[in-house]
Amino acid sequence: GALTVGGLSVLLSYANQYMKPFNDISSVITEMQNALACAGRIFALLEEKEESADPAGTIDTVTGNVTIDDVAFSYDKEKKLIENFNLDVQPGMRVAIVGPTGCGKTTFINLLMRFYDVDAGKVCIDGKPIDKLSRHALRSCFGMVLQDTWIKQGTVRDNISFGKPDATEEEIINAAKEAHSWEFIKRLPKGLDTVLSEDSISQGQKQLLCITRVMLCLPPMLILDEATSSIDTRTELQVQEAFDKLMQGRTSFVVAHRLSTIRNASLILVMKDGKIIEQGRHEELLEKKGFYYNLYNSQFQAS
């Protein structure tokens, strides 16, 4: 009963052939699991409610009066996120929105831009309900700089002039200087004609490009969501000065996580659980020694 080398070779060959179907089955099951996961996302997208029809309403001249009348909204109909929300913002006001994570700050911005429709109440710009305006007309009223930056595949010029395709080179350069992005742009291999990819510049440089877009378009109203979060301290001070200049005479909404950046706001809204629990200027809220007072002091103690 001795096993020869030839017999061992045949045995191993048969064993390999025997295991091959099991390996194939395992691979098929893995592929099926991946396909089911992909299908789940596709079906979830197909089951989403269709976006409501876009009306043809426009605004010729925007003064910047924003009114929010008894607005309610929730992502999950079983759990209210924003309810009984009322606000009257006069033209040129600088409104800061603060509060703990999940209180509804970003949701408020999404409703203002009509990324979502309100469940109840209405939002008006210069007296016109935003659901009567075309989305293009509404969103053209605002310039946005968000914490999460977005750069498209293309040149620096394309990324800056995204909202104003007919901008001249002089206008682009002036906007870049205002946003303090020109220093790094002119050091790129081809300057404004350098082709960008997602990883070709730093997060801070991406944020400066997003700020430059707004400086170029000069919209009638601004939305800033921690717009300088990825920028070094020295550049942040310079950009903040540029923003202060840009916000003069423009209605501005500033979502703030660092409370030191909103001391000069015309109105500070303190949100919690989807409701405004305090509002006023910085000094007034500190004197009340309420939620804002504790939030403000906790940041400085932590730092």
Question: Where in the sequence are the language-model features?
Answer:
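Signal-transduction coiled-coil helices of two-component systems
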Residues: 32, 49-52
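Cytosolic ends of transmembrane helices, especially the final helix of ABC transmembrane type-1 domains
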Residues: 17-45
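Conserved catalytic core of two-component sensor histidine kinases
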Residues: 12, 19, 139
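Short, charged helix-helix connector/hinge segments
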Residues: 5, 52-54
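ABC-type nucleotide-binding domain
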Residues: 54, 60-303
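Conserved E/DxxT/N motif and adjacent residues on the DHp alpha2 helix
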Residues: 44, 51, 161
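Membrane-water interface of transmembrane alpha-helices in multipass transporters/channels
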Residues: 1-13
